[in-house]
């Protein structure tokens, strides 16, 4: 016999057991009962002796409340704000490293590419005769002169600063939020 043992007061599934009926009944304490079949605690609770499927867990942080029969996020407002800010920073980095456009060409902007652009800008500042064949994000090659290389460097700077300015604006909104819903509404 396969059964699910549950807490009668809350409906929380406490264990799944297989065995003889008399052995299973001997395992039950005063606040427990069982129903036939295996209903996994991650997916079910018991209501009036019947298994009820839980809704999908919204996030790994949510905990099922057996009184309200709903998923709840137990984090404090500050913990929610900290988590949202961490998410915003990840999105900001992704946007920063996703590349940028200048004069119809897409340039890489990951950390290594930013260093390469900075180095090329430094070289361009040393000679008005500067030229370089630059491999674009599309793997096409574009020849840049001194003026163009300096403009690419400036465009990179604007691109990075734009991402950080957006992040700073979102941080102000996160700090000002007073409810979980307000915090969750702030996205990249």
Predicted regions and their residues:
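A preference for well-ordered globular domain cores
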Residues: 2-30, 48-188
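Metal-dependent nucleotide-binding catalytic modules
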Residues: 29, 34-42, 46-47
């Amino acid at each position: 016999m396969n059964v699910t043992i549950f807490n009668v007061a809350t409906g929380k599934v406490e264990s799944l057991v297989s065995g003889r009926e008399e052995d299973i009944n001997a395992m039950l304490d005063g606040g427990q009962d069982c129903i036939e079949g295996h209903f996994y605690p991650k997916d079910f609770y018991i209501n009036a002796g019947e298994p009820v499927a839980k809704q999908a867990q919204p996030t790994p942080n949510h905990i099922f409340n057996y009184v309200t029969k709903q998923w709840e996020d137990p984090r404090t407002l500050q913990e929610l704000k900290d988590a949202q800010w961490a998410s915003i920073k990840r999105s900001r980095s992704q946007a920063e490293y996703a590349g940028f456009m200048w004069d119809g060409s897409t340039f890489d902007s990951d950390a290594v590419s930013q260093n390469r652009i900075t180095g090329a800008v430094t070289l361009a500042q040393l000679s008005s005769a500067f030229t370089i064949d630059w491999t674009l994000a599309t793997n096409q090659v574009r020849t840049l002169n001194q003026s163009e290389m300096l403009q690419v460097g400036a465009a990179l700077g604007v691109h990075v600063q734009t991402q950080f300015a957006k992040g700073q604006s979102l941080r102000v909104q996160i700090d000002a939020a007073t409810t979980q819903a307000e915090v969750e509404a702030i996205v990249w």
